């Protein structure tokens, strides 16, 4: 979530988990380095559909098929309903313009086509305007199980269905607004909140744990791992989440947080950010 200028040293307690992880790696994948947007990206109907090679569509089909073998019994109702509402194709890479139109019909969100991981200010600005930044390239066949940077499968299949849920959609806009006001140690705190909700969140439904985080629903390994006995679960608590700085972004998660409802997510986030003067 951070892309500091090369001549700026970030205090240790203000570094993001991604910055820390990159410092510990010998070779940094250039896809994990955020890019600054040069002007407004294409939005909605202005997004052109790429001329994908058939291999990319086949990769998409493999990814969707693998996940859909597991998700119906593990993902939350809002996610599964979101997939239906967006009519996400299983046999070919969807059109961002079409997804944007359907998303707009559901909750007033649209899609912005971005080149990859983008600078945090650009990212937060788009969220604050109810515009979801999405790539349009799909990972290579050699990265079916894991890709260090977001691709269109993670963005479309992982994130977009949840943006059809009204409370989650409102929360994500609030997140963008609060993040634009964050300074110092509040920046990595917000990154942790994002990580343990948007990316790796769980929710309790009908007495059972269900998945909604994009980092889980788009990962074949995380889907089974997240609901296994190998993971320590905590009740949703914003104060606990924002101070949890011992997680690793490039490994399976061994601790997760469980919501009781998406209304709880909105209320908890609004209360914490208001106390911090971010909203």
Residue ranges of model-derived segments:
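The feature captures two recurrent sequence modes
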Residues: 1-163, 241-243, 257-279
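Short runs of predominantly hydrophobic/aromatic residues within well-ordered alpha helices
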Residues: 96-100, 150-153, 168, 190-194, ...
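Short, hydrophobic/amphipathic alpha-helical patches that form generic packing surfaces
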Residues: 101-105, 155-158, 173-177, 192-202
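Residue-level signal for secondary-structure boundary elements
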Residues: 111, 115, 165, 180-187, ...
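Generic structural "secondary-structure junction" signal
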Residues: 159, 177, 202-205, 213-214, ...
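A structural motif
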Residues: 163-171
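Extended, Lys/Arg-enriched charged tracts that mediate electrostatic binding to polyanionic substrates
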Residues: 177, 181-213
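A recognition module on extended beta-rich or small alphabeta surfaces enriched in W/G with H and D/E
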Residues: 216-278
């Amino acid at each position: 979530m951070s892309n500091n200028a090369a001549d700026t040293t970030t205090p240790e307690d203000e570094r993001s988990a991604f910055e820390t992880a990159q410092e510990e790696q010998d070779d940094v994948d250039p896809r994990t380095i955020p890019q600054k947007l040069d002007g407004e990206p294409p939005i909605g109907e202005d997004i052109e559909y790429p001329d994908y090679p058939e291999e990319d569509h086949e990769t998409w089909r493999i990814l969707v098929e693998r996940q859909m073998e597991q998700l119906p019994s593990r993902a939350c109702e809002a996610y599964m309903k979101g997939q239906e509402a967006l009519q996400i194709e299983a046999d070919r890479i969807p059109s961002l313009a079409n997804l944007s139109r359907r998303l707009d019909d559901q909750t007033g969100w649209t899609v912005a086509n971005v080149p990859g991981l983008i600078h945090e200010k650009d990212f937060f600005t788009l969220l604050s305007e109810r515009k979801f930044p999405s790539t349009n390239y799909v990972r290579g066949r050699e990265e079916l199980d894991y890709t260090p940077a977001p691709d269109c499968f993670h963005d479309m299949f992982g994130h977009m269905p949840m943006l059809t849920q009204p409370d989650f959609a409102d929360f994500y806009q609030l997140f963008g607004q609060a993040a634009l006001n964050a300074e110092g140690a509040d920046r990595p705190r917000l990154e942790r909140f994002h990580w343990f909700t948007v990316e790796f969140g769980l929710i309790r439904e009908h007495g059972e744990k269900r998945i909604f985080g994009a980092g889980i629903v788009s990962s074949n390994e995380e889907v089974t791992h997240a609901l296994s006995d190998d993971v320590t679960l905590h009740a949703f608590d914003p104060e606990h989440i924002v101070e949890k700085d011992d997680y690793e972004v490039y490994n399976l998660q061994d601790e997760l947080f469980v919501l009781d409802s998406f209304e709880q997510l909105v209320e908890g986030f609004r209360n914490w950010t208001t106390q911090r003067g971010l909203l």
